[in-house]
Amino acid sequence: MSERVVLVDAVRSPFGKAGSLYAETRADDIMVRTLRGLLERNPKVLPSAIDDVAIAAATQSGDQGMNIGRSVSLLAGIPDSVPGYSIDRWC
């Protein structure tokens, strides 16, 4: 393949452990804020110029189910023409 992959930025979201500040916050809400923050941090990157959104999630059930990568990318304002997918990552 001759296509180049460019990672512009990456971030790790906070944990929502029991008793923590984010314990009652849904994973998809945290990820929407995270994606919006990445877009704000990189104003030269237009949402329409993004080729893929990949989200790693430890548990693909509940609020992290139903392809969290796709749903949060849409909620964050990334065009529906941009594929979003989830990576099952037990970290």
Predicted segment positions?
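Structural motif
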Residues: 4-6, 51-53, 85
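Short, well-ordered amphipathic alpha-helical segments that serve as non-catalytic structural scaffolds
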Residues: 27-43, 68-72
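Conserved catalytic cysteine-centered active-site region
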Residues: 25, 57-91
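Short acidic capping loops at alpha-helix termini that bridge into adjacent secondary structure
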Residues: 46-52, 81-82
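N-terminal transmembrane alpha-helices
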Residues: 17-25, 34, 41, 59
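Condensing-enzyme catalytic core mediating Claisen C-C bond formation in acyl metabolism
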Residues: 1-25
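Terminal domain-initiation and capping elements
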Residues: 1, 41-43, 75-78
